[in-house]
A protein has these predicted regions:
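Flexible, gly/pro- and Lys/Arg-enriched active-site loops
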Residues: 5-39, 44-166
Length: 166
């Protein structure tokens, strides 16, 4: 299974200056629960934005066109095609971004695990690609109000590509 996981604002914004726009405790817990024990694929800048480097208990794959690229705790591939070819059939693989990696993976993904943040940031320079609603079937939603650990309301939304099994 190839899944995309992302938190996006009302205007599809996902980041600014190579940082997340919102730090939502429940979203981070969900992210950890879904990705732990699985393979994660991300672009170089996304990897470099991780405060502690490679995420533990996951196979970290970084996409970089630099032939000499090396990132501690991660495997490096030049393209999404090469990275996917290095995964096992039936393996759960999650794409973590950034913007261009999401755009490339969108046509191949089987599932979307999205957090729809009910806010629009003042500034953003990275955006999630348009979602063609006809391609996706909404399987589950879970709304969360803002609270002391989550500064804005948001909704978890899980989608399966039309024609795929649940």
């Amino acid at each position: 299974m190839l899944a995309i996981i992302c938190a996006l604002a009302l205007n599809r914004a996902i980041g600014y200056n190579n940082k997340l726009l919102y730090y939502l405790s429940a979203d981070l817990k969900r992210f950890k629960s879904l990705t732990t024990g699985n393979t994660i694929i991300m672009g170089r800048r996304t990897f470099e934005s991780l405060p502690k480097g490679a995420l533990p208990n996951r196979r970290n794959i970084v996409l970089s066109r630099r032939k000499d690229a090396a990132f501690e705790g991660a495997e490096v591939f030049a393209s999404l095609d090469e990275a996917l070819a290095a995964t096992k059939p039936g393996e759960d693989v999650f794409v973590l971004g950034g913007e261009s990696v999401y755009a490339e993976a969108m046509s191949r993904a089987d599932r979307l695990y999205l957090t729809h943040v009910e806010a629009t940031p003042e500034a953003a320079d990275a955006f999630f690609p348009e979602i063609n609603e006809a391609d996706w079937s909404l399987q589950h939603t879970e709304r969360h109000d803002a609270d002391e650990k989550n500064v804005v309301p948001f909704t978890f939304a899980d989608y399966v590509r039309q024609g795929e099994k649940k």
